């Protein structure tokens, strides 16, 4: 079984080296992939009205688009939650847990 594996490996190495030797100049190996600059149309990967947010560290918006958040808020209403009140409630709950 091992000799069969070595035979396949040797065949792959020889086939690769002979294919590379057939095209000594790297540009000749792919003549069909080149296109003339006149026929290439400019492409954009962004859909119209999508702007990428430049986010800071830790703000949670790493690369999302600006129009995703308002459109998501229309589908599912985001409740207004005061983070300070949640932190205070968590501290009170922690104190109760440590007392008992």
Swiss-Prot record:
The RxLR-dEER motif acts to carry the protein into the host cell cytoplasm through binding to cell surface phosphatidylinositol-3-phosphate. The amino acids 78-82 in the C-terminal region of are important for binding to host calmodulin. This is RxLR effector protein PITG_18683. Belongs to the RxLR effector family. Keywords: Secreted, Signal, Virulence. A motif (Calmodulin-binding motif) lies at residues 78-82. Residues 1-22 form the signal peptide. It comes from Phytophthora infestans (strain T30-4). One of its GO terms (cellular component) is extracellular region. Interacts with the host calmodulin. It is found in: Secreted; Host cell. Secreted effector that associates with calmodulin to interfere with plant defense-associated calcium signaling in hosts. A motif (RxLR-dEER) lies at residues 43-57.
């Amino acid at each position: 079984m091992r000799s069969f594996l070595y035979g396949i490996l040797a065949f792959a190495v020889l086939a690769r080296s002979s294919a590379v030797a057939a095209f000594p100049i790297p540009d000749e190996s792919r003549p069909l992939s080149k296109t003339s600059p006149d026929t290439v149309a400019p492409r954009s990967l962004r859909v119209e009205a999508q702007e990428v947010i430049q986010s800071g560290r830790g703000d949670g918006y790493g690369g999302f688009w600006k129009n995703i958040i308002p459109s998501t808020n229309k589908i599912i209403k985001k409740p207004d939650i005061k983070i300070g009140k949640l932190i205070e409630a968590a501290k009170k709950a922690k104190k109760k847990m440590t007392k008992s």
